Amino acid sequence: MIVGKVLVVALFLVWSVATVNQVFRWSHPLHLWRQAIEESPNKPRPWNNLGAHYLLDRAEHFAIDCFQRSTRLAQHPDRSYNERASGVSVAQTNLALLEAQRGEYDRALARLTPVMHLYKLQETIAAHAWITRQKTIASQ
């Protein structure tokens, strides 16, 4: 009877510590996506999401590395068409939007145009239209 109670208390303590540890990791998006990458280093989405959060933290060089890695991983031949389309489009759209923020409109459009024509995803088409509009406004 006592052994059972000790076991229950021990399990409760272990689970409590694990919960606190996980809450800490999830309390900041960078910790969350780094953990996701540790668990699934060959998936493009965690790399893309980590890059997006680096952008929010104004760490552009880390964001660019993450978006480029996400693109490479998404292009792996073992991925389905939908995985490739989504992974490449999202990462390249993020890179193009970053370039547009820097005023590099031609470079951003050159990056997006082939992706837009190949995969035809709405967010890429919308980003292309937005960058084109920003370029027009900037040139006036």
Model-assigned labels for residue ranges:
Residues 1-18:
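Signature aromatic-anchored transmembrane alpha helix within multi-pass, membrane-resident enzymes
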Residues 15-34:
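Transmembrane signal-anchor/signal-peptide helices with a preference for the extracytoplasmic
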Residues 31-140:
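C-terminal luminal/periplasmic domains and tails of membrane-associated envelope-modifying transferases
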